[in-house]
Amino acid sequence: DRTAFYPEGGGQPGDQGTLDTVRVLDTRERGDAIVHITDGPLTPGTSVTGELDWALRFARMQCHSGEHVLSGLAHSLYGCTNVGFHMGEDQVILDFDKELTPQQLTVLEDRANQLITENRPVTARYPTPEELAALDYRSKLDLTEQVRIVTIAGCDVCACCAPHVTCTGEIGLVKLVDAMRHRGGIRLWMVAGRLALADYQRKQTNIAAISAALSVQQPQAAQGVERLKQELQTLKETLKQTRQAL
């Protein structure tokens, strides 16, 4: 009759964890019911104790709050509207309705991380219909039910039903890892918090292997790859000339 598990919605996956000894693999909303998808049966009518996979939940909170920071700043700095959001296992995808230059993306990322270090409060409330009518807030949908408003002080006011951190410092950091033009606007890939650390660790492992293979220092890995490409092109041209001479 009640649960602490967040169901899939708004671009965010459902919570995982346990109900007693049974693993919860996913949580979804069906009508007015919250459905827990488990790896084993539970006896109907019995009371169970739920335990969230907190590390996973918190990582998603970091990413979702980080997305609000970026979307709020993109709106205030460049007049962008967030028209798409999807939280994957390793990255978050954001779609904006306007194109942004690499320089603008750098400013956006820098401003977002500055705001995170300021440890601004993140609050959620359910305004009355009268309060909501007078409120300027972001929303990707036409909302007809009770609206939950998540506010990041001095940055963003948005309708959102998902769990969030209590202050921006808990996000840790946000990093834009890729961008492409998309439907007249831009699609961004971002990581935040624990996912940002995991992303950095993977890339550090890769760059260490590449630099070792090329016998260069890590900051010179790109130059080492370019040198290798030029050497390969020279060898191809030499081979072509040799074959023509035979």
Per-range role (PLM):
Residues 56, 79-182:
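Functional cores that coordinate and move charged inorganic groups
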Residues 4-19, 43-94:
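Active/ligand-binding-proximal structured segments within catalytic/core domains
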Residues 171, 177-246:
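Terminal appendage regions of diverse proteins
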Residues 2, 52, 96-98, 151, ...:
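Flexible glycine-/small-residue-rich
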Residues 31-40, 92-98:
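A generic structural motif
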Residues 21-33:
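Solvent-exposed beta-strand/loop surfaces of large extracellular or lumenal domains
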